[in-house]
Amino acid sequence: MDDRPIVFFDIAIGGQLAGRVAFRLYSDLVPKTAENFRALCTGEKGLGQSGKPLWYKGSAFHRVIKGFMCQGGDFTAGNGTGGESIYGEKFEDEGFPVHHSRPFLLSMANAGPNTNGSQFFITVSATPHLDGKHVVFGEVIKGRSVVRTIENNPATNGDVPKEPVVIADCGQLSSDDPFLAERTSTDGDPYEDYPDDEDQELGNPETVLQIAKTIREVANRLYKQGDISGALQKYSKSIRYLDVHQELPENSPPDLNEQYKSLLAPLLLNSALAAIRIEPHSAANAMNAVANTSRALNRLELSNADKAKAYYRRGLAKTIMRDEVGAEQDLKTANELLPEDGAIAAELAKIIQKKKEQREREKKAYKKMFA
């Protein structure tokens, strides 16, 4: 198994590097399929029949279904209708020695029997209904959190990621590459990015609460150090752990529910703040901020000060999303809750002035039309 080839993807989401994923390929079980993927990672085969490089670099994940899989590899059309193998357009199913029994397996996408090209998918859960239909040819050995980030990136109704998920770079790694070395936590957070991948038993809500608190402390420290992007990742992670127990068991201690809520409120508000502070602004981060502030407002009992924070931050996020009407409504509500806050008043004045200038431009345009 040590001589199984290892390849990597460097993933960018919305133009920002999300991290590296490394795969070990089952060259001993399905050598032809594994070699196809390996060569498409290195780009060593040059141009294909389509006239485009036989290379995954620059191609995108065009289909992502949360709880199921992340699909990519169409470097010719980019939408799931194209792709090409190193052997020609299509090649046969080599065999089905490995079942889709767990997350983080690499499998060939196809259009029916013996139609393998370059498209692949990464499982994010067990998918036994695909056994005998799709060839499993590898597994993720590093970067599981990056795969989860792809999975949880917002998608359209057609399962297309709203923010492009691109293979910014790819290639082959030696078995002694530093990226593959075991890493210990250097920031005080030893936990997996997603609870489903955590080895520790999470059935006890008090255990999960303590994990979430630990991660929040790391997030706060990163924020104070100016690592806003890192802080957002940790705030989001802490929320994911709390969400393991959205409904607490009936026999839970009486104050445990309050402890959960008192931790969740600042996590939601702080994650929103971090999301709108990251430069350059992105629609994905703005949507994150809107979702978390809305959750805090709709599901938690907040003080007036925290309500004002939530409306203010949601208003800023809506401004980033160019939803000026929604932004003005939220900023007005925040201003009513906290009229002495200068920052809220300034943002509200700014958006009102912008609306006034827009009306003036429209008036001038109409005058020119009928002059």
Curated annotation (Swiss-Prot):
TPR repeats lie at residues 212-245, 265-303, 308-341. Residues 175-202 are annotated as: Disordered. PPIases accelerate the folding of proteins. It catalyzes the cis-trans isomerization of proline imidic peptide bonds in oligopeptides. Its main location: cytoplasm. The gene is Cyp40. It comes from Amanita muscaria. This is Peptidyl-prolyl cis-trans isomerase D. One of its GO terms (biological process) is protein folding. Belongs to the cyclophilin-type PPIase family. PPIase D subfamily.
